[in-house]
Swiss-Prot record:
It comes from Drosophila melanogaster. Keywords: Mitochondrion, Transferase, Transit peptide. Its EC number is 2.8.3.5. The gene is Scot. One of its GO terms (molecular function) is succinyl-CoA:3-oxo-acid CoA-transferase activity. This is Succinyl-CoA:3-ketoacid-coenzyme A transferase, mitochondrial. PANTHER family: KETOACID-COENZYME A TRANSFERASE, SUCCINYL-COA:3-KETOACID-COENZYME A TRANSFERASE.
Length: 516
């Protein structure tokens, strides 16, 4: 039952009574009190065809699954969905994409959703790929009333130069391409102008709310949910628990209620981990299986990468070999690992009983955190990155060039992954960029070239390249310098397998390996 205010009272008395009235709420029946709605169906009832909607979450962590299902049930069509990821085929935004309810996706990574990629390449869906940090800032700025901003991310790539395929025709030709963006120089560095996003609706998922709309998120499920709360005409939060006013300490509130228009309590959440990774207890009675050749190769690269870590360093590691390198950080060395989805202080993979779907890394893998770790939203995460506060970033590549160009996010018309946070990471001032990769493609062709043939992730951004065969440094005006050669290879081998000219260091040495 709803409590009602009556009578003519002083302002102070009215305020006190208002708080008591709001605290006396019921979620039973069709009625709602202030911001509290009965259900997802009730909360999304006024969403019309053609709406632009921000969908919180990262992969399938922290997604507003009840509202997504309500939109499916309601049958809203022609949605422009703004989401960091396209979810997977049967979860997250993928639910609406599969039903052909989404006409356009604005996001940074789509590689895990095969149906999204199919619709995009076959001309059924428009996709505007946007660097993850730029997307977070477009949303943050939109919520702060800032119409546009400048960022170093994406300069001299398709993001800035235009020409990125947004929509294909049925016959596979590019029907709509991205437009060229303005550039301005500040202190000798080029910056790209990006317009902000302010949507019709923002659908977010939180752990707790009070009737005023104050929100608390759980661990890494804060991600894009936090900035999206601020950047829409109507923000709806689905939560696992609604607590009375005053139950949340002001210090623990992550998003103030001023940004939230509607809340409802969801039930029976289907929380999943997209990539379950666990640490298996070692059985000393069972010998470890012999490593396969691919594993030996990866570990050789990872053990060389680990020599670049130093005590007190902040590092961001891409998926695959970069993450593997963290296994070789020397005991006693303190390296804080940053993850774009909002974690500082990543730990090892959890044991089976410690898996938490609200605690994943940027590769959507289950993780733990170390003592002293912290959680934050995606906008804060990329402020750390873009601001140059991360000392080193280690990424994979499809191609690299002799001048330090990097290509690792798409093959036009064939492979669509998205750039994720890579463009932001490599554009950060003062951050050392190391590329780890196999020296050659599966067909034997070189991946180190004079000029990249694929769309760039960054121009002139690489500082070091580490493969299973060699280590190169990259310097402006100098190009590639071979500084180390792996055991079993010669300089002639490196020349034969590299598609770019390079200088051999006078101090050339055998490739280093951190002891194990």
């Amino acid at each position: 039952m709803l409590c009602r205010l009556v009578g003519n009272r002083s302002l102070g008395a009215r305020y006190t009574a208002s708080i008591k009235a709001i605290a006396c709420y019921s979620t039973s029946g069709k009625q709602r009190n202030g911001k509290i709605y009965e259900s997802a169906i009730d909360a999304v009832a006024d969403v019309q065809d053609g709406a632009q909607i921000l969908f919180g979450g990262f992969g399938i962590c922290g997604i507003p699954e009840k509202m997504i299902n309500a939109l499916k049930q309601k049958g809203v069509k022609n949605i422009t969905g703004v989401s960091n990821n396209g979810g997977v085929d049967d979860t997250g935004l993928g639910v609406l994409i599969k039903q052909k309810q989404v006409s356009k996706v604005i996001g940074s990574y789509v590689g895990e959703n095969t149906e999204l990629v199919r619709q995009y390449l076959e001309g059924e869906l428009a996709v505007e790929l946007t660097p993850q940090g730029t997307l977070a800032e477009k949303i943050r700025a939109g919520g702060a009333g800032i119409p546009a901003f400048y960022t170093p991310t994406g300069y001299a790539t398709l993001v800035q130069e235009g020409g990125a395929p947004i929509k294909y025709s049925k016959d596979g030709k590019v029907e709509i391409s991205s437009e060229k963006k303005p550039v301005k120089e500040f202190n000798g560095k080029n910056y790209v102008m990006e317009e902000s996003i302010f949507a019709d609706f923002a659908f977010v998922k939180a752990q707790k709310a009070d009737p005023l709309g104050n929100l608390v998120f759980n661990k890494a499920a804060r991600n894009f949910n936090a900035p999206m709360c601020r950047a829409a005409k109507i923000t709806v939060a689905e939560v696992e628990e609604i607590v009375p006013i005053g139950a949340l300490s002001p210090d623990e509130i992550h998003v103030p209620g001023i940004y939230i228009n509607r809340i409802f309590k969801g039930t029976n959440y289907n929380k999943r981990v997209e990539r379950l990774r666990i640490t298996e207890p070692k059985d000393p009675s069972k010998p470890a299986p012999p490593p396969n050749p691919a594993q030996v190769l990866r570990e050789r690269i990872a053990r060389r990468v680990a020599l670049e870590f130093h005590d007190g360093m902040y590092a961001n590691l891409g998926i695959g070999i970069p993450v593997l390198s963290s296994n070789y950080i020397p005991k006693g060395m303190n390296v804080m690992l940053q993850s774009e989805n909002g974690i500082l202080g990543l730990g090892p993979f959890p044991t089976k009983d410690k898996v938490d779907p609200d605690l994943i890394n940027a590769g959507k893998e289950s993780v733990t955190v170390v003592p002293g770790a912290s959680y934050f939203g995606s906008d804060d995460s990329f402020a750390m990155i873009r601001g140059g506060h991360v000392d080193i970033t280690i990424l994979g590549a499809m191609e690299v060039s002799a001048t330090g160009d990097l290509a690792n996010w798409m093959i036009p018309g064939k492979l669509v992954k998205g750039m994720g946070g890579a463009m932001d990471l490599v554009a950060a001032p003062g951050t050392k960029v190391i590329i780890t990769m196999e020296h050659n493609a599966r067909d034997g062709s070189p991946k180190i070239l004079d000029t990249c043939s694929l769309p760039l992730t960054g121009k002139g951004v690489i500082d070091m390249i580490i493969s299973e065969k060699a280590v190169f440094t990259v310097e402006k005006g100098v190009g590639l310098t071979l500084i180390e050669v792996a055991e079993g290879y010669t300089v002639d081998d490196i020349i034969a397998s590299t598609g770019a000219k390079f200088t051999v260091s006078p101090n050339l040495k055998k490739m280093g390996q951190i002891p194990v």
